[in-house]
């Protein structure tokens, strides 16, 4: 799909290694921050009840919603590969078109999946449990998940494109602010303080994903990534 010059020197080039670290380190840091945030969220959800119903409902909802996540992750990774090459070739308009198209396809597909799961939730959750109270709770989470997936797939596509372009620290900074302000703080406020429990936590996480998605799109549209390219072809 991509034609590029072969350069044996790149295999042992310290410059190339430094460029890899420049992208890889912020990405690893963002993942670490995300995992720590999820640890806080699970901690708060464990405080919502004594029988672990809210944490269990979250686990069921995540298993079902993972199908939507896979779509967004696949499109984000594929677009990131093409974006890296196009930036190296200075084909910035193609980067814009490709990233926008990947985001649109991802949003449509992920939304279709998540809406289907929300409508068919009562039937799907029966795979895991026959507890009516649990089923009703998971279905509520799947309804909120429609908005969560909308934000997440946008966040994934534009976030990966920014990282590939060399603008790797912006997603980390944005993620650190919104993950802990919206997802973690929102889980405590809505879930525990307001008494919305797992539904409140999901609303907070949906707010986090959508807020970060807006930030990623605005950063991409600013065009600052055009001056941060690391690869030449």
Identify the function of each model-found stretch.
Residues 9-40, 63, 67, 71, ...:
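Hydrophobic faces of transmembrane alpha-helices in multi-pass small-molecule transporters and flippases
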Residues 32-63, 67, 85, 123-132, ...:
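Helix-terminus/linker motif at the lipid-water interface of multi-pass membrane proteins
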Residues 1-25, 83-148, 190-233:
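Short alpha-helical transmembrane segments in multi-pass integral membrane proteins
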Residues 72-76, 145-164, 170-182, 186, ...:
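Short runs within selected transmembrane alpha-helices of multi-pass transporters and secretion channels
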Residues 42, 55-121, 152-175:
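Small-residue-rich hydrophobic transmembrane alpha-helices
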Residues 27, 31, 39, 43, ...:
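Transmembrane alpha-helix boundary and packing residues in multipass membrane permease domains
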Residues 33, 37, 41, 45, ...:
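Alpha-helical membrane-inserting segments
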């Amino acid at each position: 799909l991509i034609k590029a010059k072969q350069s044996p020197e790149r295999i042992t080039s310290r410059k190339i290694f430094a460029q890899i670290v420049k992208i890889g380190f912020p990405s690893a840091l963002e993942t670490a921050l995300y995992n720590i945030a999820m640890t806080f969220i699970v901690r708060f959800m464990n405080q919502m009840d004594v029988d672990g119903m809210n944490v269990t409902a979250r686990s069921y909802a995540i298993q079902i919603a993972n199908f939507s996540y896979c779509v967004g992750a696949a499109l984000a990774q594929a677009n990131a590969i093409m974006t890296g090459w196009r930036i190296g070739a200075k084909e910035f308009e193609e980067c814009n078109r490709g990233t926008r198209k990947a985001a649109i396809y991802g949003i449509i597909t992920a939304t279709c999946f998540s809406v289907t799961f929300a409508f068919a939730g009562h039937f799907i959750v029966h795979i895991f449990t026959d507890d009516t109270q649990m089923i009703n709770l998971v279905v509520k989470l799947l309804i909120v998940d429609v908005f969560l997936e909308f934000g997440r797939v946008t966040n994934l596509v534009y976030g990966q494109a920014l990282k590939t372009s060399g603008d790797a620290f912006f997603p980390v900074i944005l993620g650190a602010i919104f993950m802990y302000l919206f997802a973690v703080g929102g889980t405590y406020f809505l879930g525990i303080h307001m008494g919305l429990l797992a539904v409140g936590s999901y609303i907070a996480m949906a707010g986090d994903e959508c807020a970060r998605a807006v930030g990623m799109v605005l950063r991409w549209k600013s065009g600052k990534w055009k001056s941060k390219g690391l690869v030449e072809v």
